[in-house]
């Protein structure tokens, strides 16, 4: 099974991914974690470029897609074939929300390019950890920000709006209230996962 965690920066998605990893391991499942951009030697080099160098929005999108294509072929596809649970800290919907929505490159264009980059491999479940932008900004105040995190509140509002728009059209895209405490948020995720595992 392939599960992706999405959210604006500061949403707590990475914390929830770690909690799910521990939970699945305790249930005897084989688990592998990946992050985007990154997760391969090439992907980590691309990550450095994306987070630290200025570039135009088309270059940004294509670099994310290159990292994703490599990650699918090197890690995600082989892991799924071996029966692992693959947990991704961001995947294709990040490009739809950030580059398609907030950068105005267009949702349809990014969706088509995602199909090409992933060779049609997409998550079985997506958990979007949703929090208001102002809460995300407060949470990120303590942290050193990368290039994309420095974009500001208007940019993040566009990202969040695009994610919520995606949720309306996909049955496997679950919006989780990230404003609650960590344990409560995880209980919502666990309930959905348990339903999937018990079928």
Swiss-Prot record:
Residues that hold ATP according to the record: 7-14
E.C. number: 2.7.4.9
A Pfam family annotated for this UniProt entry: Thymidylate_kin
Chemical reaction(s) catalysed: dTMP + ATP = dTDP + ADP
Coiled-coil region: none
Keywords of the record: ATP-binding, Kinase, Nucleotide biosynthesis, Nucleotide-binding, Transferase
Similarity-based family: Belongs to the thymidylate kinase family.
Role: Phosphorylation of dTMP to form dTDP in both de novo and salvage pathways of dTTP synthesis.
Record PANTHER family: THYMIDYLATE KINASE (PTHR10344), UMP-CMP KINASE 2, MITOCHONDRIAL (PTHR10344:SF4)
NCBIfam families: DTMP_kinase
Protein name (record): Thymidylate kinase
Provenance organism: Thermosipho melanesiensis (strain DSM 12029 / CIP 104789 / BI429)
Record lineage: Bacteria, Thermotogati, Thermotogota, Thermotogae, Thermotogales
Designated gene of the protein: tmk
């Amino acid at each position: 099974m392939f599960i992706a965690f999405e959210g604006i920066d500061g949403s707590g998605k990475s914390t929830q991914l770690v909690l799910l990893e521990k939970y699945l391991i305790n249930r005897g499942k084989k688990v592998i974690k990946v992050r985007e951009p990154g997760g391969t030697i090439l992907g980590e080099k691309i990550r450095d470029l994306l987070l630290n160098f200025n570039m135009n929005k088309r270059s940004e999108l294509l670099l994310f897609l290159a990292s994703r294509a490599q990650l699918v072929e090197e890690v995600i596809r082989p892991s799924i074939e071996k029966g692992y649970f693959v947990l991704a800290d961001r995947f294709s919907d990040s490009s739809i929300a950030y580059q398609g929505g907030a950068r105005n490159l267009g949702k349809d264009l990014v969706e088509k390019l995602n199909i090409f980059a992933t060779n049609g491999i997409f998550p079985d479940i997506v958990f979007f950890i949703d929090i208001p932008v102002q809460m995300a900004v407060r949470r990120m105040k303590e942290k050193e920000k990368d290039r994309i995190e420095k974009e500001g509140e208007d940019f993040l509002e566009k990202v969040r709006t695009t994610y919520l728009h995606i949720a309306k059209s996909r049955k496997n895209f679950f919006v989780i209230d990230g404003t609650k405490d960590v344990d409560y948020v995880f209980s919502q995720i666990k309930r959905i996962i348990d339903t999937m595992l018990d079928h």
